[in-house]
Amino acid sequence: MPETLARARAILKSTFGYDDFRPGQGEVIEAALRGDDLLAVMPTGSGKSMCYQLPALVDGALTVVVSPLIALMRDQVHQMRAVGVAAATLNSTSTEDEVTDAWTLLRAGELRLLFVSPERLLTNGLAGHLKQAGARRLAIDEAHCVSQWGHDFRPEYRDIARARAALGDVQTLAFTATADRATRDDVVERLFPRRPQVFVHSFDRPNITLRFAPKDQPRRQLSQFIERYRRESGIVYCSSRKRTEALAETLTRHGLRALPYHAGLDQGTRARNQDRFLQEDGIVVVATVAFGMGINKPDVRFVCHADMPTNVESYYQEIGRAGRDGLPADTLTLFGFDDMALRRRQIDEKDIPDERRRVERQKLEAMIGLCEAPTCRRQALLAYFGEESGPCGHCDLCAGAVPVVDATVDAQKVLSAVARTGERFGAGYIADLVAGRENPAIQRNGHTALKTFGAGRDKPHGAWRALIRQLFAAGAVSETDGEYPGLRLTEKGEAILFGRESIALRPEAPRKASRDQRRREAGSAVEGLDPSDEALFQHLRALRASIAREEGVAAFIVFPDRTLIDMARLKPIDLGAMRAVSGVGERKLAAYGARFAQAVGDFLAR
């Protein structure tokens, strides 16, 4: 093992309390210690930040970290200072005291990590000052933001190359969790003065269970799902502020501790709700998709989407906020015909270049394809990022597999109804017509006399709604323009209607609970802990929450769940035994070790 990597491993243990690197970290850290420029594509929760933190501690030189996420920068500064590392942040919300503190450390040559927003890096000659202070390394987080092909393009990231030039010939490290090949190539071209090493690790997050469900009383579906995780933290994403507040109220009425979070709330309310989410267990935040960007909370146990995401990258990034501690986490995504139609209209109405519109449409179609995947969800998700895998065995489809069947005849009934009604009516109307529902509109329009009226009485109404949604996803029908869009046949739809093509679809069926879900419902909420150890784990969580409130920090900055679980297993009652717990470094041992050892001893003495 190279000497510098051995030193990094020693610091990993003494400072952070971990015995070894996470999978994939070692090779990236080794390249960084050699001085190589690099781009690392690593899944959320794999420990990307450690790949620039450790090199800064090994060589003692200043590392400048660029991030668009102010909350994440603040959290990382708190985390670094909690383990004795000199770190600071400069961004648009920095207080006068924070700015003074950063410059004091910088001038004294003591600063190891400076977190800055991309726009701040070019303000008031900051890059030049950092060059004079001996900045040796530039680390760029969320590097996909520089690419026009990425799902989260930010124009200010285009200026990072200019800032890097002002810093001098510094080593450049770029990190992202979501970048397909086109995005990676764009990042390399725009951020690096020379060809970097590129590390692309698996996108798989095997600790996260993937579930999708067609919308059917979505508030009830979400409440029932979240009820299983009453003592755990989670995030529910909604597409609008109004839906966010309404759903938070619904969950609260069901006895859950739900808080809304969106840009329309005043800053004080947002800050209070975010602090409760970070400091307490069992809080559910119902939010617009902006929430969670930069929320460095490793013990989020579930993420729900009340509405279908716009693209696979956003979906992957948002579910990636669950289970960052490597422990089991769950997800649920609800989707429906209205979601698909709305997302398509939003793209069509955007004032963007045609090439960008084409890319966004392709990304949306991939998201719709994931919702309607006929086989393993994880396999389909990884395939989108160019990664081959076998069936995972525990997503919703693997756990309750429903075979794909030839649906051509049923599709023809729907398509015929669309054609015979003049392509003027929406999905609900067509489903009523085929199912034989004599609603007033159908009677008024004389459509009870059509051959297709009641042609599908042998199936429930919901089955026809589901079939129409899948036909829409498959591109057999689209929507007409106008205030009240109706369904119309596409070329593919006409080919199916007239028998030139067939179509296979997956019938709707209730999903069976996965093995992991049944285990959770039957016993311990933490995989691998027996009930008595879980009681100790919850006791330690309560102590952690108390300390977090005392210090005004996020609970995981005291200790993450993974460390508390190890404590519950090992049951250390003195500082010597506490040293063996994963995640307890020397600084935290001194700060918290005695209180937690006392708590373990008191619990065991009961």
Residue ranges and their predicted role:
Residues 1-8, 359-361, 388-606:
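Accessory DNA-binding and partner-docking regions appended to nucleic-acid-acting proteins
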Residues 168, 230, 374, 423, ...:
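Flexible coil/turn residues that form the inter-helical turn or adjacent wing/linker of helix-turn-helix
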Residues 2, 6-15, 19-23, 27-49, ...:
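Helicase motor core with emphasis on the C-terminal RecA-like subdomain
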